[in-house]
Amino acid sequence: MIITIAHTKGGVGKSTLAWHLAHSFENKQVKIIDLDFQQTLYFVNIISGDTLNVLQPLSVDELINELEAVAPDDICIVDVGGFDSDINRAAIEHSDRIVIPISESITEVLGFRTFEGILKELKVDAEIHVVLNNIHPLTKNFDIIKEAVSKNKMKLLNTVVRSRKIFRTAMGEGSHIFKVADHLQAKQEILGVRDELRCNQ
């Protein structure tokens, strides 16, 4: 299964979500394709001791070859950069699941609408899911996001991933949320995203 974490806006937490989500799968072969020009996941994986297979295809053809090699029972998570490009569009078009991280701010909604336009241009057969990500712990009202998503053929996940220091700290140390003690709620949030995507069966 190919899961693409996508948004044309940078700073929405795509790489952080992709990294922790990749470590949530049990008894699965998991690889990451890092298309972000910042190469965040590539370098975090080096710090971790190369615990995952992180690839950086340099062309559309190379990317497609990697995606076509993904077995049905394996997991491939694609972290696209915060910009529009041919290689990012190819990743989206070859996905089984597209996950769009978004926060509650009005600027995020505007960025979401821009990305929505790109999706309409592409031939996308994948399920498209929106996840409230990097959300302030006290925020409860998501009406703006719900309204934006309701106008599209997308599903807003019930799981809300809150802004948590441990997500960033663990990642910065080359670790992940499932390797640290405690922080049960943070772990449940990542598992909630995984389970709602129905890709650990």
Pin down the residues of each PLM region.
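Conserved C-terminal guanine-recognition region of P-loop GTPase G domains, centered on the G4
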Residues: 110-125, 133
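Inter-motif core of Ras-like GTPase G domains
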Residues: 86-105
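Beta-strand-loop-alpha "switch" segments that mediate conformational coupling across diverse proteins
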Residues: 136, 147-176
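Inter-lobe coupling/hinge region of RecA-like P-loop helicase motors
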Residues: 168-187, 191-194
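P-loop/Walker-type NTP enzyme "switch/lid" segment
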Residues: 2-12, 19, 23-86, 171-175, ...
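Short, conserved loop/helix-junction motifs that constitute active-site signature segments
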Residues: 94, 120-125, 149-150
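Structural beta-sheet core signal
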Residues: 32, 78, 100, 130-132
